[in-house]
Amino acid sequence: MRIKKKGTSGNAKNFITRTQAVKKLQVSLADFRRLCIFKGIYPREPRNKKKANKGSTAPVTFYYTKDIQYLLHEPVLGKFREHKTFAKKLQRALGRGEVSDAQKLEGNRPKYTLEHIIKERYPTFLDALRDIDDPLNMLFLFANMPATDKVSHRITKEAEKLTNQWLAYVAKERLIKKVFVSIKGVYYQANVKGQEVRWLVPFKFPTNIPTDVDFRIMLTFLEFYSTLLHFVLFRLYNDANLIYPPTIDTEKLKGIGGLSSYVLQSKDQGVKALLPNAKKAADSKDESKKVKETKLSKEEISKAVAADKSLNENAEDNVSENVEDVELDEFSSTNKTAGDLLSQPSKFASPTSTLLSKFIFYVGREVPLDILEFCILSCGGSIISEIALDELQLNQPEEYKKLDLSNITHQIVDRPTVASKVAGRTYVQPQWVFDCLNKSELLPVSQYAPGETLPPHLSPWGDAGGYNPDAEVKPTEQGEEEEEEEEEIEGDEIEEDVEEEDEEEDEDLQAQKELELEAAGVKSADAQKKDKKSSKGKKRSAEDEEKDLKKIMMSNKQRKLYKKMQYGIDKKEARQDDLTKKRRKLEKTKAELGKLNKKN
């Protein structure tokens, strides 16, 4: 039997360190990181680090050897090497002062594409849709960032364009399902091709960019994510029979911007627009052909006409024979009644897609237009902005006078009072739109009137801890809490004496006990309550004993797992109890304030 050489099998063969991988690929560390991000290769943790590192215990990063071998055949790797030589040549030309050569080199800069990597990592379109959450979050983050020395203006504009194209598609197809306005930003959830997609849009506030963030890694992710979103948007727009990329109204983009500046046209409309131009071009070609045609003699024309007649007669005879021979099949309908025919589902079958279709909203200038515009358009509603009307009044006063604002049904305001109200309009706060969208129904407007205290804006995805804020507080729980407070005030000595008493006492002993308690100044009703609590405590102690016995029978691994599980359960229950106590206190204060207001 041959002796195996150390470090040639097992973990030492399956894993490779980062320094070894960089040497093998012959690239810089920055290019290696970019390549790993593009290909989706991440560090691995071997079971035995010492064996994987061939006896060394130094802290290192490991990768699978197969992954690094897979990177050797990547075309982008060759482009990285070409760029390295290009940078050397450019630096040499600039150092010599050869500006024309430097310009030629700049024109021939090596470029790479990520299309083949997208196809490798996402073989089907649904795979890309399932992984679209992180790209959307990253792109919306960069779209709201200001341009700095590390992040150029071109990158932020490209991210903004892609995100607006995504929002325009979701609003056009009415795919939005849930909205939640939080401290971090606005969470949206849409159902795209049967896949639930959730993303976060930050608020458009001035942001302080931290200095400890490595923007090189973030920009690498952004490059990959933008390519992926281009693929997804192209497929979604084509499936919806829309032109991609959508046309942009430059006048609106200079003014308000947002979704209103993106004009989504179907491909049929684009073809109709091109048809008149095509007809004109065809007519001009025919005219030129007529001019170029030579005049034929009368004999040639008569021969051609006779030949055409004979061909037409033969063709008609053949067609009549074929038609006589063919017998058409008759398909009788199996449906006895005409009412049994099923109606096809409409495009906007979900309740949220047509929730606000009958309303026209007038949005005040103090309300964030981008959030409400997206939500209202996704629910089928129409929107008129006060800011857009102000711009129209300044730039085109004649068209502004022709506008008819009598069709407006709702006005969204975010002010405590409205100075002058228009008859026929319903005045609501912005939260009404979000809550209606989350509940998939129109809620009463009275709670959302200007100046009213709004109901709590709850997350539509619920609480992971199990706390339900909509659930009513049971009166029994309140009674138990009051009993606990009373018992805390009373003396501990009497409690201990009562808990030690047994339930199966004789009547004489019970009477003697009541006399002793009355002498101590405790009422008989309170003593009965304490007896009940003592019985509950005994039941709990019996359950605890059973649990302890079960723990003894567990193995060491099972016991540790049970402790971890119990710790998590206790933590959730403690959080739930704290939240219910806070809610009870709030309800008490509200009730007291209501009583004071009634008295006044």
Curated annotation (Swiss-Prot):
Covalent S-S links between cysteines: none
Gene Ontology cellular component terms for the protein in this record: nucleoplasm; PeBoW complex; preribosome, large subunit precursor
GO biological process: maturation of 5.8S rRNA from tricistronic rRNA transcript (SSU-rRNA, 5.8S rRNA, LSU-rRNA); maturation of LSU-rRNA from tricistronic rRNA transcript (SSU-rRNA, 5.8S rRNA, LSU-rRNA); maturation of SSU-rRNA from tricistronic rRNA transcript (SSU-rRNA, 5.8S rRNA, LSU-rRNA)
MF (Gene Ontology): large ribosomal subunit rRNA binding; ribonucleoprotein complex binding
Pfam family, one: BRCT_2
Keyword Nucleus included in the entry's annotation: yes
SMART domains xrefs: BRCT
UniProt xrefs under CDD domains: BRCT_pescadillo_like
Coiled coil region boundaries: 478-600
Stretches the record annotates as Disordered: 454-600
Principal subcellular localisation of the protein: nucleus
PROSITE patterns for this protein: BRCT
SUPFAM superfamilies: BRCT domain (SSF52113)
Keywords recorded for this protein, A-Z: Coiled coil, Nucleus, Ribosome biogenesis, rRNA processing
Ranges of Basic and acidic residues composition bias in the record: 569-580, 588-600
Domain BRCT: 351-450
Bias (Acidic residues): 478-509
Positions with biased composition (Basic residues): 530-539
Localization: Nucleus, Nucleolus; Nucleus, Nucleoplasm
Family membership: Belongs to the pescadillo family.
Stored PANTHER family: PESCADILLO - RELATED, PESCADILLO HOMOLOG
Subunit structure: Component of the NOP7 complex, composed of ERB1, NOP7 and YTM1. The complex is held together by ERB1, which interacts with NOP7 via its N-terminal domain and with YTM1 via a high-affinity interaction between the seven-bladed beta-propeller domains of the 2 proteins. The NOP7 complex associates with the 66S pre-ribosome.
Cited function: Component of the NOP7 complex, which is required for maturation of the 25S and 5.8S ribosomal RNAs and formation of the 60S ribosome.
Protein name per its UniProtKB record: Pescadillo homolog
Lineage: Eukaryota, Fungi, Dikarya, Ascomycota, Saccharomycotina
Gene expressing this chain: NOP7
